[in-house]
Amino acid sequence: MTTEKIDNITVQTQANVYFGGKCISHGITLADGTKKSVGVILPASLSFSTGAAEVMECVGGACEYKLSGADDWVMSSAGERFSVPGNSTFDIRVAPGFDAYHYICHFA
């Protein structure tokens, strides 16, 4: 099931813009203090580093990802999630001509 809305949040109004605008996100804080980000990745191939573990939830579009040390790319589309260990890296790509990848990043 895809998350369609999140109630009772505080939104950081200043966007986080990465990779020349290919990835744009906003930080959110839930009423219980839990932090997440919601964003979009436009067609591109990008590499990210994590501090804390993350769960990436696709809420629209699709991407392929490859975790650090993995050989194969894995597809993720709306309603699917993938986990990224803390203190690691992962690659993500959205193919040209495909819809943007819309996501919620759940921090551990």
Place the predicted regions along the sequence by residue.
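Conserved short histidine dyad/triad with adjacent acidic residue
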Residues: 29-51, 81-86
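Ligand-binding loop in jelly-roll beta-barrel domains
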Residues: 85-108
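Short, surface-exposed charged micro-motifs
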Residues: 27, 55, 81, 91
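A short, N-terminal "cap"/entry segment at the start of jelly-roll beta-barrel domains
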Residues: 1-34
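A generic structural motif
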Residues: 29-31, 66-68, 93, 106
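Short, conserved beta-strand element in jelly-roll/cupin
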Residues: 50-65
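Short histidine-centered beta-strand/loop micro-motifs
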Residues: 38-40, 46-51, 67, 73-75, ...
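Short acidic-glycine-tyrosine-enriched beta hairpin
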Residues: 70-90
